[in-house]
């Protein structure tokens, strides 16, 4: 469960840093939000703080801290703009790696992370 939370955090961090190709709106900086992490039949609430740092014209590195009632997780990763307001990439927490899909709209991001262990869905807002 913690790996999924970490992966989600990482994804969110990467997306916030990237610049939208079409709208040229920067998502770089700090974001905060919440959502759910699912692993099998277990579903937990998660809260995340994400920081995006631009690494190239269309990509960013992310660093995140996410918490659930079961613990605190640090997540890192990378995301790339794949067109318009959509981003994809990977995040890592501990030994777990996940795939990130993010949609950016104004001051909000919808992030989905999937891994062999489960998935996470988080909504982030600019801090």
Task: Indicate where each model-derived feature is located.
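Central antiparallel beta-sheet cores of small beta-barrel/beta-sandwich binding domains
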Residues: 25-127
